[in-house]
């Protein structure tokens, strides 16, 4: 979906994970692997779709920090604006690789942060043919 950040257009995706018996851990909260997995592909997909076919985009690294137990439905928002895309384009215009970290908070229905996820992407402009 499109959105505005200040006066800039941006792209926004929201992911939702409902708690079920198969994603619940031994103590009855969301399994940490499910919280990480719900966020896994989205930064790479958003960047690939918006930079276009002239770029290599790969997941490089990731981490998760568990803030509080996640219960019920949890959500994560991904907002990619033109300023980030401009940074990625300018950092790779000479053909060098660029590593960029993206941060995403996972919230419960009360709006409390239950986890902070970081994903690092490898981005490189493809050679001209």
Predicted regions located by residue number:
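Single conserved hydrophobic/aromatic residue that forms the stacking wall/gate
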Residues: 1-6, 10-11
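Short N-terminal helix-initiation segments at or just after the protein's N-terminus
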Residues: 7-8, 22-23, 41-54
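Short, aliphatic-rich beta-strand segments
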Residues: 12-19
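Hot-dog-fold acyl-thioester-processing enzymes
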Residues: 23-42, 56
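Hydrophobic beta-strand-centered segment that forms part of the acyl-chain substrate-binding groove
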Residues: 46-83
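HotDog/MaoC-like acyl-thioester-processing domains
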Residues: 70-71, 81-129
């Amino acid at each position: 979906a499109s959105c505005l950040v200040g006066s800039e257009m941006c792209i926004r995706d929201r992911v939702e994970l409902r708690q079920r018996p198969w994603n619940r851990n031994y103590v009855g909260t969301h399994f940490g692997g499910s919280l990480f997995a719900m966020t896994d592909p989205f930064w790479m997909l958003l960047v690939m779709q918006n930079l276009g076919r002239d770029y290599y985009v790969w997941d490089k690294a990731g981490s998760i920090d568990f803030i509080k137990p996640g219960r019920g439905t949890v959500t994560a928002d991904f907002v990619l604006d033109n300023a980030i895309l401009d940074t990625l384009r300018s950092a790779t215009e000479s053909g060098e690789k660029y590593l960029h970290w993206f941060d995403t908070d996972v919230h419960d229905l009360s709006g409390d942060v239950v986890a902070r996820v970081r994903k690092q992407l490898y981005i490189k402009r493809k050679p001209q043919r």
